[in-house]
């Protein structure tokens, strides 16, 4: 089995560190990517960390993941609440998925309370800032160790 986890990030996450830091924190997406890579390396696997503001690009990356990665960590951002296509793509590739959100979406506007992704994810981590990514990767580290 491949020991790579695809970490996908949706729209506006390229603005982390400057966009609403009181909600999303001060870490940049580049810093989060570096932290994810360093954590994965200590646990013996790799991450492929990506971000896009184009929904079609995100869907293409998900489709290409089948047979190439062991699982997906995804912060779908606003597409969480709007994209049936994203939900369908994640279901179609039949990979384990962990959904991550920096903020606690359930403490925010009502429209953020619904996720199209959650029904096809193994779990959801929200409200812990950038730590959520590491927690999601910890899940995959434990899967790899159990399979060894």
Curated annotation (Swiss-Prot):
InterPro entries from the UniProt entry: DHquinase_II, DHquinase_II_CS, DHquinase_II_sf
Keywords: Amino-acid biosynthesis, Aromatic amino acid biosynthesis, Lyase
Record site feature (Transition state stabilizer), residues: 19
Catalytic residues, chain numbering: 24, 101
Catalyses which reaction(s): 3-dehydroquinate = 3-dehydroshikimate + H2O
EC number assigned by the record: 4.2.1.10
Binding residues for substrate: 75, 81, 88, 102-103, 112
CDD domains assigned to the protein according to its UniProt record, in alphabetical order: DHQase_II (cd00466)
Pathway stated in the Swiss-Prot or TrEMBL entry: Metabolic intermediate biosynthesis; chorismate biosynthesis; chorismate from D-erythrose 4-phosphate and phosphoenolpyruvate: step 3/7
High-level lineage: Bacteria, Pseudomonadati, Pseudomonadota, Gammaproteobacteria, Pseudomonadales
A molecular-function term among this protein's GO annotations: 3-dehydroquinate dehydratase activity
Official protein name in the record: 3-dehydroquinate dehydratase 2
One of the Pfam families matching this protein, by short name: DHquinase_II
Superkingdom of source: Bacteria
SUPFAM superfamilies assigned to the protein according to its UniProt record, in alphabetical order: Type II 3-dehydroquinate dehydratase
Quaternary structure (record): Homododecamer.
HAMAP family named in the record: AroQ
């Amino acid at each position: 089995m491949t020991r790579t986890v695809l970490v996908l990030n949706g729209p506006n996450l390229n603005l982390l560190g400057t966009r609403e830091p009181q909600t999303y924190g001060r870490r940049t997406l580049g810093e989060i990517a570096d932290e994810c890579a360093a954590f994965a390396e200590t646990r013996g696997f790799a991450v492929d960390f990506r971000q896009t503001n184009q929904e079609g690009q995100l869907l293409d990356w998900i489709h290409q993941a089948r047979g190439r990665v062991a699982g997906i960590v995804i912060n779908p951002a606003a597409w969480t609440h709007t994209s049936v296509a994203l939900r369908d793509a994640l279901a179609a590739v039949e990979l384990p998925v962990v959904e991550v959100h920096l903020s606690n979406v359930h403490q925010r506007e009502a429209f953020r309370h619904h996720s199209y992704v959650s029904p096809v994810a193994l779990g959801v981590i929200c409200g812990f800032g950038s730590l959520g990514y590491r927690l999601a990767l910890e899940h995959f580290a434990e899967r790899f160790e159990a399979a060894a």
